[in-house]
């Protein structure tokens, strides 16, 4: 190979090697020093040695002098002797002095004068080192915490059999007897004595048609099938009864108790396999009620409540059935026959059945304004005391109640044990004043007064003392003595109600005469009465689901009672009473009826029997099939992958839905509250359960089995239309809630639990203080005041409970009674606030057990800390979601260190900052505090206050503001914000993209459009600078600019603010180009994520996420108007402002190929026709924004979004110098739009609670969207009916079967009819939804095309 040059180089000097290396690496020459002569080298060595000797001599001299000073003898002084204790004290003081000096230097207190210069030097050197090394104090970041197992996991034990010492039959019976309420131990043991075992072989019948229906059957082991006969004589299995469940009918139990027992007609139950059944005869209850008569009223009341809530809720509210639920074959009682009057009780065939509520009825068009006469029989009392005029039509309830403490006031019952009748009294929502109790009754009326009522009606009242000489002035009784008519009517009423002492009716009954067209009571009225028809008839109407029309349920004839169901249950009236022609009736108020029941409890049986007699045979069948189910806290209702065989309706309590991913990770999907429909999509589509649903707290549900639904579809095919509506509403709701334009791809929102706000549709809220310094009473009163503007609110604390229910109310023996009483209060109020004690008392435990959500309240100006009560709470499995609420003084600084508050706690679902009025922090005694808030409650709550914002969050009425991206055009956001403030629209949540994230962050920090405008104008002015961008230019590998100048401009605005420290909840959107996904930022450094959301490709480099290092770009590429994100965070209404550029859509068609020279000629030639063809840059831009455009179309067509777009198309993206012009355009546009909203009452509807306006519709979509299908497929799924079992029933007589299965003939009633197919005649076409009706005509938006469902026959 020869001698290479490489070998020669190895022998070269080291200087030459270094020279060559540096020349190759740096690309420039390095001059190497030449070798020096020998003589100068020797001279240098000599000079160095001399210097070293000189330094050594100096050091030796200094050491010698120091030693001489130490050897100098000191003058001897007196030598002292010390005792041991003095030495200990001396050295002890010396040590303590040293310790005090060291600690004082640590806390920067007064130190000695000698140490101060040292400390200053140390600090100065430390600062210099920080500047050199650029050491910065890192701001704390929010720690990612997963929800605890108690939130995401249900209990593994599904029953109490393994953990209980009681036998299974006792537990099963206890569980199923609870359907009739809680029985004390002696009552339950008395019932268990009547329990009988019954063993059945496969195919054996438990009962068959024709046999007595007088028992409750509980399955201990095996399987029972509940069957109903079909049209072809075959039996259809409508329900399978597993061990632990029961077969019973509340109406049948009521018939036995009231003494009107009937045999089974159509229902049968047989054993699907060998089974053991426990039978409890209903006669056992009669024996118990003989010993404990007060329990009778309570049990009957519970039966009525569950009949109304379970049966009517499922069949009417969700399946749309109306007059199919009531019988029309009741024979009227002729009390005062009048010739020529019809006696029919059912609607007339061929007459109009549907009445429009928007217009006037045919029969009442001319008589609606006629007066209403009534002759009253007042209660005796002191002479001369006038009675207040009463009106048949109750006035609407006030919007704001001044009740601060418990509104139920029952005189004489406080402080003592609660009896069953007391519970029934409160269930009926009766309030008895102390004055009435003391005086023996209400005050009497003055003789013969005629008063004008507010509704335009007249009341004629008189005293019984003068009635002997007075005659009846109206109706068929003209000329007869009023007293004789009144006494005869009272005798008939006493006979009907089986009142042993007729004097109980004295002073408690009013005689009324209503002119034709008068509305006696309206649907939804709370203050109801009992009406006993004497002459004429009362028509009972009910509002149809999703239509502004009413349907006639039945006609009450003479001798019938109306309104007894609402009187017994205490629930609002479920129908409207209207006198279509002149009618005379007796009226007993609810309070008077309960006074009669207190004197004679058996009266409740007669009233309940009249309700049961009105129920149709179909309702009796459904009473067997539809179950009332109770689920204890922590127990799973069903698990993911289970078979979908039923649908549930939440009656009381709260459920949580959790999904388990393929990786095994569990995530929170949503929560369900009162009135929500669960599992309907899975049940109708025959899909396995998509998630696991467990109870957050003790929950009651109505269970609608799959077989029962199939039977209803066979009997009433019009139900299919309603099911199609329900199912399409659920699926459409899921489609609207899909985040991102490509569901299932990486461009959609990751389904994390923090991206949803399950704290909505709450019924109960527990309030827990962090420390004793939190003004809990004032805070709860402020929150109650804000909630009262939304709906009835109740505040409970331990003092209120003891005052109302007695000192022993919190004892364990009273647990079931207290639970029942609290459940009543939750039913009667929109939301109940539970104020805990400052320690872990039994009341605190009860509050946490009852809570749907727990608010942890702390003081924002204190050091972040965890309270002792919270630490105790961590050791218990609390399933309710927790939210942190920090209170701040009105004039104090803004929020800080929120991250530290959150990091030291376990998982919280969210946090809120509240700016509180001064009165909340004032120190007052409880009496003075209540006196102060009495005045506060007399005023309406400010909708812009932070407590009103918290109230909207808790009730699910949050209003979100979403600001889109568009460069300088985003300055118009501030003008719209100013107009929004002037219109009085509150904002509870702010989000945005690009420039929208910048403006939104300013508004979330300032909460004032004026201050937001001032700070945004300063920043826009800096954006017009030319020098800074020029200095920021760089070599364009990734971007044209380094981003440093833009970073400084954003940092100057927000400093080191954290997103968690903003006043309003805030989020923004970025595009993660590392993971090809959309990122939603709700915590972290504010300026960084705002900058990331404003990062345009090519101009600025992507921002590195400080959390995971992912590269973040402008969120406008994927979601320029993130209204769907705000919706997923719990917003009811989203106001979305779009300022993006409008792309040209009218492009030229140039054929299959395109020549660039041709385009150049077209552009240069002034006489050629201009062509519109995008260049390469525009094509790339359009490709980048494809998903954004599609997402925008989805947002614009959604029902929850108020889409706004100012006229800003004439401004360019970088026109920041035209800030004031763009602001004025937005302001003028906002004034015009919000002015139209004010005139159209859109704002008021926006602030109205959705539970009060949308009672008939489910508020929550089901858990997961199933594969999309066409409308024909949807109809096929819903209308699919399983063939009945091939078993021919031979135990039901033809006549008996026809009584229940044949459609009734409508032969009476002036305005009710039904066509052959069962669908209503004359029904108007389905109108748009209520949400669409609220939209302002000034909005610019695009609607989804409405699809018309096919006919029921086609389905």
UniProtKB/Swiss-Prot annotation:
Activity across pH: Optimum pH is 8.5.
Extent of Acidic residues compositional bias: 1293-1309
InterPro entries: Acyl_Trfase/lysoPLipase, cNMP-bd_dom, cNMP-bd_dom_sf, LysoPLipase_patatin_CS, NTE, NTE1_P-loop_dom, PNPLA_dom, RmlC-like_jellyroll
Binding locations of a nucleoside 3',5'-cyclic phosphate 1: 179-306
Record region (Disordered): 338-395, 1286-1355
GO biological process: angiogenesis; animal organ morphogenesis; lipid catabolic process; phosphatidylcholine metabolic process
Tissue: Expressed in brain, testes and kidney (at protein level). Expressed ubiquitously in brain of young mice. Reaching adulthood, there is a most prominent expression in Purkinje cells, granule cells and pyramidal neurons of the hippocampus and some large neurons in the medulla oblongata, nucleus dentatus and pons.
Residues recorded as bearing Phosphothreonine in the entry: 345
Cellular location(s): Endoplasmic reticulum membrane
Keywords (A to Z) from UniProt: Endoplasmic reticulum, Glycoprotein, Hydrolase, Lipid degradation, Lipid metabolism, Membrane, Phosphoprotein, Repeat, Transmembrane, Transmembrane helix
Positions annotated to bind a nucleoside 3',5'-cyclic phosphate 3: 610-730
Residue span of motif DGA/G: 1114-1116
Cytoplasmic side: 65-1355
All copies of domain PNPLA, residue ranges: 961-1127
Ranges of compositional bias, category Polar residues: 343-361
Protein family according to the UniProt entry: Belongs to the NTE family.
Protein name as annotated: Patatin-like phospholipase domain-containing protein 6
């Amino acid at each position: 190979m020869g001698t290479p040059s490489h070998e020669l180089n190895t022998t070269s000097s080291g200087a030459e090697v270094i020279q060559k290396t540096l020349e190759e690496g740096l690309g420039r020459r390095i001059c190497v020093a030449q070798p020096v002569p020998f003589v100068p080298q020797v001279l240098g060595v000599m000079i160095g040695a001399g210097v070293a000797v000189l330094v050594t001599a100096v050091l030796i001299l200094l050491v010698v002098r120091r030693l001489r000073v130490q050897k100098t003898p000191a003058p001897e002084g007196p030598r002292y002797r010390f005792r041991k204790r003095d030495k200990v004290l001396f050295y002890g003081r010396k040590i303590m002095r040293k310790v005090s000096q060291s600690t004082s230097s640590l806390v920067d207190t007064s130190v000695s004068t000698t140490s101060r210069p040292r400390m200053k030097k140390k600090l100065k050197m430390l600062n210099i080192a920080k500047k050199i090394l650029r050491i910065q104090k890192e701001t704390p970041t929010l720690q990612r915490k997963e929800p605890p197992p108690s939130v995401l996991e249900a209990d593994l034990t599904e029953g109490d059999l393994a953990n209980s010492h009681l036998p299974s039959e006792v537990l099963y019976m206890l569980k199923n007897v609870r359907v009739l309420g809680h029985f004390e131990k002696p009552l339950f043991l008395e019932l268990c004595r009547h329990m009988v075992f019954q063993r059945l072989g496969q195919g054996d019948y438990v009962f068959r048609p024709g046999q007595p229906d007088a028992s409750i059957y509980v399955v201990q082991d095996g399987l029972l099938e509940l069957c109903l006969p079909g049209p072809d004589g075959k039996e259809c299995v409508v329900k399978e009864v597993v061990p632990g469940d029961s077969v019973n009918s509340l109406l049948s139990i009521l018939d036995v108790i009231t003494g009107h027992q009937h045999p089974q007609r159509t229902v049968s139950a047989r054993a699907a396999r060998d089974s053991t059944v426990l039978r409890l005869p209903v006669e056992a209850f009669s024996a118990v009620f003989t010993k404990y008569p007060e329990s009778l009223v309570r049990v009957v009341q519970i039966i009525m409540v569950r009949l109304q809530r379970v049966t009517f809720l499922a069949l009417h509210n969700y399946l749309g059935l109306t007059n199919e639920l009531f019988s029309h074959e009741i024979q009227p009682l002729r009390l005062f026959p009048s010739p020529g009057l019809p006696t029919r009780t059912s609607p007339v065939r061929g007459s109009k059945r549907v009445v429009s509520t928007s217009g006037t009825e045919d029969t009442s068009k001319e008589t609606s304004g006629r007066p209403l006469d009534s002759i009253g029989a007042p209660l005796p009392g002191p002479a001369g005391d006038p009675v207040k005029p009463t009106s048949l039509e109750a006035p609407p309830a006030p919007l704001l109640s001044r009740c601060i403490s418990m509104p139920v006031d029952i005189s004489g019952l406080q402080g003592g044990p609660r009896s069953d009748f007391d519970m029934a009294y409160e269930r009926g929502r009766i309030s008895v004043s102390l004055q009435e109790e003391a005086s023996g009754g209400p005050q009497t009326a003055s003789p013969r007064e005629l008063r004008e009522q507010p509704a335009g009606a007249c009341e004629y009242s008189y005293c019984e003392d003068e009635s002997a000489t007075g005659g009846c002035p109206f109706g068929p009784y003209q000329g007869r003595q009023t007293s004789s008519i009144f006494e005869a009517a009272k005798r008939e009423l006493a006979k009907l109600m089986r009142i042993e002492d007729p004097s109980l009716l004295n002073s408690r009954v009013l005689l009324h005469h209503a002119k034709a067209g008068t509305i006696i009571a309206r649907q939804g009225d709370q203050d109801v009465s009992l009406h006993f028809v004497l002459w004429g008839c009362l028509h009972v109407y009910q509002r149809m689901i999703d239509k502004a029309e009413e349907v006639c349920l039945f006609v009450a004839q003479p001798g019938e009672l109306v309104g007894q169901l609402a009187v017994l249950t205490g629930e609002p009236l479920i129908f409207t009473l209207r006198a279509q022609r002149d009618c005379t009736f007796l009226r007993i108020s609810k309070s008077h009826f309960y006074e009669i029941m207190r004197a004679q409890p058996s009266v409740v049986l007669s009233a309940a029997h009249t309700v049961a007699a009105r129920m149709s045979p179909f309702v009796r069948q459904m009473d067997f099939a539809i179950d009332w189910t109770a689920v204890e806290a922590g127990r799973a209702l069903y698990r993911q992958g289970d078979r979908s065989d039923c649908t549930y309706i939440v009656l009381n309590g709260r459920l949580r839905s959790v999904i388990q991913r393929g990786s095994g990770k569990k995530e929170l999907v949503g929560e369900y509250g009162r009135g929500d429909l669960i599992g309907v999509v899975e049940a109708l589509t025959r899909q396995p359960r998509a998630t696991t649903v467990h109870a957050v707290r003790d929950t009651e549900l109505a269970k609608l089995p799959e077989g029962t639904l199939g039977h209803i579809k066979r009997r009433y095919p019009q139900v299919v239309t309603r099911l199609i509506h329900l199912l399409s509403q659920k699926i459409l709701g899921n489609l609207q809630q899909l985040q991102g334009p490509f569901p299932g791809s990486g461009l959609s929102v990751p389904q994390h639990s923090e991206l949803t706000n399950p704290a909505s549709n709450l019924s109960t809220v527990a309030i827990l203080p962090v420390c004793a310094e939190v003004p809990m009473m004032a805070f709860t009163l402020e929150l109650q005041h804000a909630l009262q503007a939304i709906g009835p609110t109740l505040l409970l604390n331990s003092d209120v409970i003891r005052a109302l229910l007695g000192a022993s109310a919190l004892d364990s023996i009273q647990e079931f009674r207290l639970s029942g009483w609290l459940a009543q209060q939750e039913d009667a109020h929109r939301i109940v606030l539970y104020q805990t004690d400052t320690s872990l008392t039994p009341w605190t435990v009860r509050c946490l057990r009852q809570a749907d959500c727990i608010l942890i309240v702390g003081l924002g100006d204190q050091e972040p800390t965890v309270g002792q009560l919270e630490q105790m709470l961590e050791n218990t499995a609390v399933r309710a979601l927790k939210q942190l609420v920090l209170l701040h003084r009105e004039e104090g600084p803004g929020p800080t260190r929120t991250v530290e508050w959150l990091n030291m706690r376990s998982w919280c679902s969210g946090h809120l900052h509240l700016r509180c009025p001064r009165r909340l922090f004032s120190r007052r005694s409880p009496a003075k505090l209540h006196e102060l808030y009495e005045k506060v409650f007399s005023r309406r709550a400010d909708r812009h206050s932070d407590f009103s914002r918290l109230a909207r969050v808790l009730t699910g009425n949050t209003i979100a503001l979403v600001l889109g991206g568009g460069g300088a055009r985003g300055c118009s956001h501030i003008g719209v914000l100013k107009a929004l403030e002037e219109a009085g629209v509150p904002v509870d949540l702010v989000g945005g993209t690009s420039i929208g994230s910048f403006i939104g962050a300013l508004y979330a920090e300032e909460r004032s459009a004026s201050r937001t405008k001032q700070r945004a104008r300063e920043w826009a002015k800096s954006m017009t600078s030319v020098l800074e961008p020029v200095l920021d230019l760089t070599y364009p590998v990734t971007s044209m600019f380094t981003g440093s100048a833009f970073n400084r401009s954003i940092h100057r605005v927000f400093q080191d603010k954290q997103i968690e420290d903003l006043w309003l909840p805030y989020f923004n959107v970025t595009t993660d180009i590392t993971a090809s996904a959309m990122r939603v930022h709700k915590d972290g450094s504010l300026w960084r994520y705002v900058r990331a959301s404003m990062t345009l490709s090519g101009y600025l480099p992507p921002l590195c996420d400080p959390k995971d290092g992912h590269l973040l770009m402008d969120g406008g590429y994927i979601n320029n108007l993130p209204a769907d994100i705000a919706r997923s965070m719990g917003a009811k209404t989203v106001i979305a402002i779009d300022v993006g550029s409008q792309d040209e859509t009218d492009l030229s068609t140039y054929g299959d190929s395109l020549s660039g020279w041709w385009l150049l000629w077209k552009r240069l030639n002034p006489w050629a026709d201009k062509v519109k063809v995008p260049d390469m840059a525009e094509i790339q831009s359009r490709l980048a924004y494809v998903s954004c455009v599609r997402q925008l179309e989805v947002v614009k067509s959604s029902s929850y979004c108020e889409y706004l777009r100012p006229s800003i198309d004439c401004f360019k993206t970088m026109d920041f110098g035209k800030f004031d012009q763009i602001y004025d355009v937005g302001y003028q546009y906002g004034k015009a739009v919000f002015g139209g909203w004010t005139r159209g009452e859109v704002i008021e509807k926006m602030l109205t609670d959705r539970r009060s306006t949308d009672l008939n519709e489910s508020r929550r979509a089901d858990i997961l969207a199933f594969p999309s299908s066409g409308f024909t497929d949807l109809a096929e799924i819903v209308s699919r009916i399983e063939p009945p079992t091939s078993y021919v029933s031979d135990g039901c007589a033809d006549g008996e079967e026809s009584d229940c299965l044949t459609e009734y003939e409508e032969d009476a009633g002036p305005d009710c009819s039904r066509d052959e197919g069962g669908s209503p005649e004359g029904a108007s076409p389905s109108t748009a939804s209520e949400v669409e009706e609220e939209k302002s005509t000034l909005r610019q938006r695009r609607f989804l095309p409405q699809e018309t469902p096919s006919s029921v026959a086609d389905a």
